[in-house]
Amino acid sequence: MKYLQALIVVLIFSSCEKDEIPVAYIAPELQQGTFITQIEMSSDYRYRTYYDLETDMVVARHRKRDWDLGFSSVEGDQRIRLNSSRLMSVYRIDGVPFEDIGSVQGEGPLYDRADGTEAALDDWQSGDGVYVINRGYDAEVNDMGKVKVELQSMDATGFTLRYAVLGSSDIQEVFVPKDETVNMVMLSFDEGVQNLEPPKEDWDILFTHYTLFFDELFGQQNIQYLVAGALINPYQVEAQDLDLTEFDDIDVDYLQGVDLTSEEDVIGYDWKEFTLIGESYAILDNAYAIRTVEGNDYKFQFTNFLDENGERGAPTFQAALVD
């Protein structure tokens, strides 16, 4: 990331009613010219908000506390993701029966990488598949507790596992089905299987809190931060941070020389920085190229992070189709 000073440890949350707002997908009628949009994440970043560039619409939104694990729906893919918007982590345990685990132990803490290249649970089929999972923090900064999980099997139809609150003998068994229309199906340790993510063909950008992990930073080992930013859809979306930040100068000819990437945090968080003077946010020079699920190229630039009342968590951007 370009601006380490932009790292912000954000653990200030508040509760709200469960709010999912699926919006029916409409075949995109591409806008001509520049459009300006503001996304409401809320000042405590309680929401994970899915946005589609072609329609300039929020297609779904849910609270970050609504799920714990995300199970890949890609055919043959065994990946299981943590809910990175809660600073979750795991400890891998080998050689200890599931029923005997009563405390945090094993190799860890392990985290998912924000770029999507590695997940803490990636090797679950190579060992015993037993983990202690730290569920992180809810919207009010309450510790959501810890569970032990045994990931048992995966086939073409889904995943089988069992879990229990750490220290409890009440073991829950669950099957999480694959759904080819989405990237992943979620599981809440409180509410069971959750269908929260919109169809993978319907969105391009996820505005959310997410965990940023460093093996080493400023001489400290294994540093984790919660940051507020934008992640791209791992299904077919590509993007790149541009050297040219004059929005009007970004055209087809310029983008032909840009190499796009599928790293999910390529847009990320560091288009802004926190300023101690006034305790506010400054927008840094930024511009991005984004190729959508449909294969259309857009130029994209953040212009603000505050709402009309000066509250954070309301990223505003301008975007335009480049053709």
Feature locations, PLM:
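C-terminal motif of bacterial Sec signal peptides marking the signal peptidase cleavage site
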Residues: 12-15
